Regions:
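Active-site-proximal mixed secondary-structure blocks
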Residues: 1-32, 37-104
Length: 104
């Protein structure tokens, strides 16, 4: 399939699989989110259920990382999307470093 130029649009299409990272209880936790989108040039939208364990860390720190999943990351992303950080330590699943703003 050939690439098609859709112009200068604020869209993520096709929708990529997205992993959100956040610090929860002193450890990194990873979550696969159901929806991400671009609201403007300076902000994005992330949609997830209020009940997710990762929300505790996001609400406390007001920080998260957005990670678009590559083909090589798929098995790990599938894993972090199928178990809860409330019962499983997912901090070692992905290699990461702390960003300047304190996000994994």
């Amino acid at each position: 399939m050939e690439k098609k130029n859709i112009g200068n649009l604020l869209v993520l299409y096709p929708k990529p699989m997205t992993v959100v990272g956040a610090e929860v209880g002193g450890k990194v936790n990873w979550l696969v989110v159901g929806h991400t989108g671009i609201i403007g040039h300076d902000r994005i939208l992330v949609s997830m259920s209020k009940s997710h364990y990762t929300n505790q860390g996001i609400r406390k720190s007001k920080k998260l990382s957005i990670n678009l999943v590559s083909r090589d990351m798929l098995p790990k992303a599938d894993y972090v999307g199928s178990v809860s950080g409330a019962s499983v330590d997912k901090s070692g699943v992905f290699d990461f470093h702390w960003g300047e703003n304190g996000t994994p």
